[in-house]
Swiss-Prot record:
Superkingdom, natural source: Bacteria
Cofactor note: Binds 1 lipoyl cofactor covalently.
One GO process term, biological-process aspect: glycine decarboxylation via glycine cleavage system
Function: The glycine cleavage system catalyzes the degradation of glycine. The H protein shuttles the methylamine group of glycine from the P protein to the T protein.
Gene Ontology cellular-component annotations: cytoplasm; glycine cleavage complex
Protein name, entry field: Glycine cleavage system H protein
Family: Belongs to the GcvH family.
Boundaries of every Lipoyl-binding domain copy: 24-105
Alphabetical keyword list: Lipoyl
Residues with PTM N6-lipoyllysine: 65
Alphabetized Pfam families for the sequence: GCV_H
Cofactor(s) the record lists: (R)-lipoate
InterPro entries in the record: 2-oxoA_DH_lipoyl-BS, Biotin_lipoyl, GCV_H, GCV_H/Fam206, GCV_H_sub, Single_hybrid_motif
Amino acid sequence: MNIPDNLRYTKDHEWIKLLEDGLTALVGITDFAQSELGDIVFVETKPVGTKVAAHGTFGTVEAVKTVADLFAPAAGEIVEVNAGLDDAAIVNSDPYNEGWIVKMKLDNPADVEALLSPADYSALIGE
């Protein structure tokens, strides 16, 4: 299972990457999540400009066998939705790069540090 060292993780299997400006972050689902979901056919998010609470839902991922809610790792505003998600399978093939789901402007970027480290997430999923 791929668990990049430069990200933080949630118990709900989302990842977050704080960007260079220190205020915005990319959010997506983990390699573990995409493999558990199976073939992803559609991703729906709340629109740009939506404020989302930490652990609040910001969208859904629809796979062949199930639909799963997406939970925000930290509070903030959705400032961009990945246009590449028109081909939702990108979340399966490249969940940490081209398959990111939303970009958020975080209310408190320091909250990211309180999330699971790569080692903690690895332990959570039994890797």
